[in-house]
A protein has these predicted regions:
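Flexible, compositionally biased loop and terminal segments
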Residues: 1-243
Length: 243
């Protein structure tokens, strides 16, 4: 399939990160419960992966459920977990023809999940481990501070065990102990709903990432919106801290 002419010749990001904000406000505007918005958000995620694959984007990291999201009502948390479980159990029918090309990696803390959820996570990761056209990181019970603390503990353990000299700790060593160690840092972060903050997401990895904010609620974010973000990204000059 030929790319849209607006992005046919642009500098395409290798890795995009997404904070899909606005599901609840989208539902409220329609007189619906939050669960309705989260369900629509799953469909928007499916379309995101489909479009990212079409455009040649290699990595998509999606902030599905943060460590702070446990503070929401019990009914809403259950609805989100049920949607997540349904997605990873039935991803082959939900993602469509692209299923043979997408590798799923679920990152975050799994300690609070039921055995059924953990088993389903392991299943989808195992079934898709050889797919390499698009790597889809799904962040669930994820927090950037927790990720950094966990990486620090692993490095400290290696130093204590004599596997690593403290003077050999570098940016790369630290990055290799993060959940996203197999991926380059995101080139572009997209956040929907008009909010302009990173909310404890990929705190280390976003050091030199370009940010794109849109007023669209996540369920309304589609192909045209992704194209707009990519076009704007391509017009920026990335300096990585230099002049």
């Amino acid at each position: 399939m030929d790319k849209d002419p607006r992005i046919a010749d642009i500098d395409m990001p290798l890795h995009i990160a997404v904070i899909p904000d606005g599901n609840r406000r989208w539902a409220k505007a329609r007189g619906k419960l939050p669960q309705f918005g989260h369900k629509a958000g799953v469909e928007a995620y499916r379309k995101l992966l489909e479009n990212a694959g079409e455009f040649g984007i290699k990595y998509v990291t999606f902030y599905a459920f943060s460590t702070e999201n446990w503070k929401r009502t019990e009914s809403e948390v259950k609805a989100i977990m049920d949607l997540f479980l349904n997605y990873i159990k039935n991803y082959d029918s939900l993602i469509g023809p692209a299923r043979s090309k997408v590798r799923f990696v679920v990152i975050g803390n799994r300690d609070k999940f039921s055995k059924d959820v953990v088993k389903s996570i392991e299943r989808i990761e195992n079934l898709t481990k050889d797919n390499d056209d698009l790597i889809a990181y799904i962040c669930v019970d994820y927090g950037g501070r927790s990720e950094i603390i966990n990486a620090t503990k692993r490095i400290a353990q290696d130093v204590r065990d004599g596997k690593l000299d403290i003077d050999d700790i570098t940016d790369k060593v630290f990055a290799d102990n993060l959940y996203t160690y197999e991926a380059p840092d995101p080139d572009l972060l997209i956040r929907t709903s008009g909010e302009e903050r990173i909310s404890n997401f990929l705190l280390w990895q976003l050091a030199y990432t370009e940010f794109y904010f849109t007023d669209k609620y996540w369920p309304d974010f589609g192909k045209e919106d992704l194209i707009e973000a990519l076009v704007e990204y391509s017009g920026r000059q990335r300096r990585y801290g230099g002049k």
